[in-house]
Amino acid sequence: MQLIGTISGEVSPTNFNVLLSGASVGKGSYVKINHDDYGWVLAKISDIRRSLSNAGEEVISAKAFTIGYKQDGVVRMPKTPFKPMDRVYMADGELITNVIGLRRTKVGNIYLGSLDGCGIPVYVDLNKTIRKHVSVLAMTGAGKSYTVCVILEELLKNDIPIVIIDPHREYPSLKVENDDYDNMMAYAVKPASYASKITEYTTNPLTNPDAKKLCLKLRFNVDELSEIMPIHLADKQKMILYNALHRLEGQEYTIYDLINAVRLEKGKDKWKVISLLESIASTGLFDGKPITEKDLVKAGHASIIDLKGSEPWIQQLVVTKIAKDLFAAMKLNQLPAFFFLIEEAHNFCPERGFGEAMSSEILRTIASEGRKFGLHLCVVSQRPARVDKNVLSQCNTQIILKVTNPNDLRAIGQSIEGFTSGMESDIKQLSVGQALLVGECVEQPITVNIRARETKHISAIEAKGKSSDEPKKPSLDRLRPFLVKEKEFEVVGEKPPQKDKEKEKQPAEPKPKEENKGREDGRLQNKKKSLRGKIVGLFLKDEEEMKK
């Protein structure tokens, strides 16, 4: 045992001072004291000071707080203080692991990394970590996505189903083995690929041709359909929508059938509804065979919803629809418990005052009610102050990397019970790749050096074997099913009102002579044919090169 000093000054059961004897001890070091009544008690150094004695000699002292001792599987605090002059020793790994709760069990562990300052492996209980909601919060560049991927690797190894909302296509790198062997050796990690356990769905097949096209169920009531509209509907417009849905009740229908049903309604208010429905139809999200909840949630499998390149309202539409369908299925006990990760959560459940998203309501519901049905939420954001405070406060496990913004720190403090100024100071001083772990999974907030990934930390483009400025071209065969086609459907009902030409402010363009018009039309057609030939030729040439 390494003696580091003795207790000095006033002592309480929870706090005391240590007069150091020159041993190498730093802030955050774990120490132990042998209590007369309770045996070895674990404590932690919270501050170190240097000063001069009256005799002019240097004095090094430290402040420490008591963590406790383990009795009958429960961590307890001593009821009586230590004695002045009691000896203080460096804590051993066995005591630290036992008291804080880092011991590895046979099943259901998550290996996060090592305990800062002593290198002890940090294993946390799966049930206590993810089954009561998780938040991963950090400033940009602090290692947030890297940390999330470490968690995902552990969940896949434990056969936990995962659904990932991925606005920037950050998570396909889970398919590629890590080749940073030195870093992996430091954490006893082996390279791995989870390609066989991952399915990508995309809202934009042209930018991610290897993914499956995301198709959603077209089953809504009036309120649900109103929620996903790009703008708010008036009561008259809702009534038109209600009547149209009533016409289609009991039959299979498409978005275009719904548009036709609205056309049969009377009054000018229907044209706004038609315009909004056409904007939803243009997304292509309701074309083709829809994915089911059972497609998304499978044991030991991760479904990545790639939203990259889609407009914000389309992203929110997707999250709203998927979250509602998954939550409804969980309430009916149709799916196994799963991990629902929301990246860029501040865009999908913003705090009031930072805007409103159509997905906010369902995510608040999942945060407050989801855990009892087995739907375990993970909120990921680099702007904690902009995330709904009620959602954040429902996360029982917080993994906090470096944050320096005062507003973000305030939001974090409000979401954590027992948050102290010392914890705030620790968060601001974290290095890249370090995280403060707080929650039921540990008896005391701890600083963790996040382990090396088993998979490679690279962009999705690099994961496909291309450089970032040479995106992969889709083959013509793969592209053909996703080419946008004009939807032909029978136009029924009255035509939309035409503008009064007499009221047009701008004068009409002079009509070209007939012969000039014919020539211009001919040149335009030739240009279109030439351009079409070049585009098709580009894909055919690419396919021929691939065959060679």
Residue ranges and their predicted role:
Residues 165, 342, 380-381:
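Hydrophobic residues in beta-strands of the RecA-like P-loop NTPase core, especially within AAA+ ATPase
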Residues 150-151, 170, 224-225, 240-243, ...:
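Alpha-helical scaffold elements adjacent to nucleotide-binding pockets in ATP/GTP-utilizing enzyme cores
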Residues 154, 169, 173, 179, ...:
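P-loop NTPase motor domains
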Residues 107-199, 437, 469:
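Glycine-rich phosphate-binding loop of nucleotide-binding enzymes
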Residues 50, 68-71, 131, 168-172, ...:
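Conserved nucleotide-binding/hydrolysis micro-motifs of P-loop NTPases
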Residues 365-369, 373-451:
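Conserved ATP-driven motor cores of ASCE-family P-loop NTPases powering translocation/secretion/packaging/pilus
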Residues 433-548:
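Conserved P-loop NTPase motor module
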Residues 1-137, 146-153, 158, 333-336, ...:
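Basic- and hydrophobic-enriched, low-structure N-terminal and domain-boundary segments
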